Amino acid sequence: MGRMHSRGKGISASALPYKRSSPSWLKTTPQDVDESICKFAKKGLTPSQIGVILRDSHGIPQVKSVTGSKILRILKAHGLAPEIPEDLYHLIKKAVAIRKHLERNRKDKDSKFRLILVESRIHRLARYYKKTKKLPPVWKYESTTASTLVA
């Protein structure tokens, strides 16, 4: 299946480990992993950033194989989950950056077009998250208040 607004096919992906169980060389307990996830979330890191730090610095290849649940589910259990889903947050952040660029460069027609594409992705994703009840049904993306969502 192709990408939404580009020519790419999206074939490349990271290789998941074959075994779903925790590695034998890993001596970290699930409670330690939970505590470190909560510690990183309180610092303001996103779930994907937490996963990268745990993989690179702490030697935990996959949180789900150690704890039995994913990072976002652990954050929800402790009440630390972000109010806006991460992918929607990054799209809003990108739209705010493009709007800021367009304030300085009014004649940049390509950026205007890209802003339309990004905002259509935001609306499509918001519709999905409202349907799956990850966003409240009255939530609405507005370009005027978007910078307060990201700040």
From Swiss-Prot:
PROSITE patterns: RIBOSOMAL_S15. InterPro entries: Ribosomal_uS15 (IPR000589), Ribosomal_uS15_arc_euk (IPR023029), Ribosomal_uS15_N (IPR012606), uS15_NS1_RNA-bd_sf (IPR009068). Disulfide bonds: none annotated. One of its GO terms (cellular component) is cytosolic ribosome. The keyword Amino-acid biosynthesis does not apply. One of its GO terms (biological process) is translation. Keywords: Ribonucleoprotein, Ribosomal protein. One of its GO terms (molecular function) is structural constituent of ribosome. The keyword Ribonucleoprotein applies. It comes from the Eukaryota. Belongs to the universal ribosomal protein uS15 family. NCBIfam families: PRK08561.1. This is Small ribosomal subunit protein uS15z. It comes from Arabidopsis thaliana.
